[in-house]
Amino acid sequence: VAGLAESLSDSPIAEHFDLVGFDPRGVGHSTPELGCRTDAERDAWRREPMVDYSPDGVAAIEQISRSFAQKCLDRMGKPFLASVGTASAAKDMDAVRAALGEDQINYLGYSYGTELGTAYIERFPDRVRTMVLDGAIDPTQDPLESLVEQMAGFQVAFNDYAADCGRSPACPLGTDPAQFVTRYHQLVDPLVARPGPTSDPRGLSYADAITGTVNALYTPQYWKYLTSGLLGLQRGANADDLLLLADDYEGRDEDGRYSNGQDAFNAIRCVDSPTPTDPAAWAQVDQQIRQRAPFLSYGQFTGFAPRDLCAFWPVPTTSAPHPASPAPPGSAVVVSTTRDPATPYQAGVDLARQLRAPLITFDGTQHTVVFDGNACVDDAVVRFFVDKVVPGDLFC
């Protein structure tokens, strides 16, 4: 919110509204701060490639997840872990509204914030004046379906990045679109056996190369850093930019201190929706991801795959996939980007239908767009917030 306030300082939004943000339970400066791993444990986690999908390899990966879950339980306790989650955060939002003495809120939610906004308007529909949800999460999707669609979205973004990179003969992925994924694997797969060179003594692990790549795919503004990091791998030289991208995603500062964002994210998602525990279901998901997101897939399909961390979570879920409740007429607008890697476009289409809200479509390759400089989107959002002028379905 601090960054948004600066970018909106000359906007009608700043003239008409106070900007209020909050850290949900366990996140950021909220207390107690949810922390499951020490900084050293986070570094060690990132050194694990976790790509051996043989039965023994899967068992070893799942043991790492079990250890994570146990550390969360030991350090935070079951009552607190059970109290985090979107359902609780929506109630906390209403407590903030009441504390501010406001009858209604005007809400802008990005990415996970769309899930939080959907939960709020479901519980407190009369307390919403205007709500804009950008980068939507479809509340009807189960975790496996959502994971496959998200990975497919990152493949689309990777293809866009590679096509842009491939316009230059110096592109580390080459210039042949049919070879982009193969060339990528030739650069990153050797990191499973040996980290790549960086000025940081940690080196670049395979996991960090993947994480750094994924982070760069959120916005074209990061593509140049991805290219720089991949060029470093190609030359056997310095891959610092890929490590910096991974550190940015993981919330690690230059002194080696981590934010608690990733631990909190995992704790929240694990209580928000039931996670299948059948190993066969996860093997099927692995097969689907290999088909739809080949740049993320190491080695060959084995018929085995590790279950997600949430399959071992020590507290029960507090919600389940279900359609969003229709929003009061004229109170909500959904924004979705055609090639959003993290929250695929179709999720926005589906959420808008469930809320019976208009949809603003932005044609682009990035994660979220409101107040990122697109006049078509921003003008419609400002008119909606300030004057409650509800846009029709709009294409920008």
Residue ranges, per PLM feature:
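Conserved alpha/beta-hydrolase "acid-adjacent" motif
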Residues: 341-346
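Conserved acidic catalytic loop of the alpha/beta-hydrolase fold
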Residues: 75, 79, 90-105
